[in-house]
A protein has these predicted regions:
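Short loop/helix-cap segments at secondary-structure boundaries that form the rim of catalytic
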Residues: 42-51, 98-105, 206
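A conserved donor-nucleotide-binding helix/loop in the catalytic core
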Residues: 57-89, 141, 175-187
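A structural signal for short, well-ordered beta-strand segments and their strand-loop junctions
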Residues: 37-38, 86-90, 110, 147, ...
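N-terminal anchoring/stem segment of glycosyltransferases
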Residues: 1-68, 76-82, 151, 217-224
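Catalytic core and acceptor-binding pocket of nucleotide-sugar-dependent glycosyltransferases
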Residues: 137-221
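GT-A fold catalytic core of metal-dependent nucleotide-sugar glycosyltransferases
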Residues: 70-117
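Short beta-strand-to-loop element that shapes/binds the nucleotide-sugar donor at the catalytic cleft/hinge
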Residues: 106-134
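Short, polar loop motifs at secondary-structure junctions
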Residues: 36-45, 91-99, 198-200
């Protein structure tokens, strides 16, 4: 199968790119045909044994870069639709154990490590397209690692890009940006595969969970 791993690495976040790629070379779907799609504003040289597709992407200050991720993916619909499955991974993460075919499914999400299956902090303003009512059943998912079939992922990306743009036109930014919109979408379109927090584990926490993908600790003011 053709697998695309989407990574946004602009401005100071470029420092995390090579370590992530090297870790993915070792641990991410080693039995599949993987292409790394790198969205960046830099001229880069990456060491990898896998295929690379570098897509020039303008950097925007936080939170506009994360809010715009689904728009970026939608703008590259034709290229990304060549893949059978697509996964997005935050660049400031690192694979530390095998991630295999268990993640292959139509709509794949990861339980947020800060909430471990709870409701988390969904968007509470009814004016936002990301709004989740208190009586709606939900589990809170992380925005840092998710994916699915190219058809389902790009369908989601198109819808979320439109919703985020609709919010912005009314001067609304959801509480956790794109992650809030992801969680709203999954209430309406339940995931077909839910990964536990070992697939998005905060660095130096939960060593007992058999960690597979770490969210690296960083000083936000030094990279945003």
């Amino acid at each position: 199968m053709k697998i695309g791993l989407l990574i946004i690495a602009t401005n100071k976040y470029i420092q995390f790119l090579q370590p992530l790629i090297s870790s993915a070379d070792n641990f991410f779907l080693n039995n599949q045909d993987v292409t790394y799609y790198i969205f960046t504003d830099r001229d880069i040289q990456i060491e990898t044994s896998r295929k690379l597709c570098i897509i020039n992407t303008e950097h925007k200050d936080w939170p506009w870069m994360t809010l715009g991720r689904y728009k970026i993916f939608t703008e590259n619909y034709k290229e990304l639709s060549k893949m059978d499955y697509i996964y997005y991974c935050d660049v400031d993460m690192k694979f530390v154990s095998d991630v295999g075919n268990e993640i292959i499914s139509d709509r794949v999400v990861t339980i947020h490590p800060g909430f471990l299956g709870g409701r988390g902090t969904p968007e509470h303003r009814i004016e936002s397209t990301a709004y989740i009512a208190p009586d709606e059943n939900m589990t809170y998912y992380a925005g840092g690692f998710n994916g699915g079939s190219s058809e389902k992922f790009l369908e989601m990306s198109t819808i979320l890009a439109e919703r985020i743009n609709q919010d912005l036109s009314r001067n609304i930014i959801a509480i956790w940006h794109d992650e809030s919109h992801l969680n709203r979408y999954m209430v309406d379109n339940p995931p077909t595969k839910i990964l536990d927090n070992s697939y998005c584990c905060i660095e130096n926490e939960y060593p007992e969970c058999g960690r597979k993908l770490l969210a690296l600790i960083k000083k936000h003011n030094e990279v945003r």
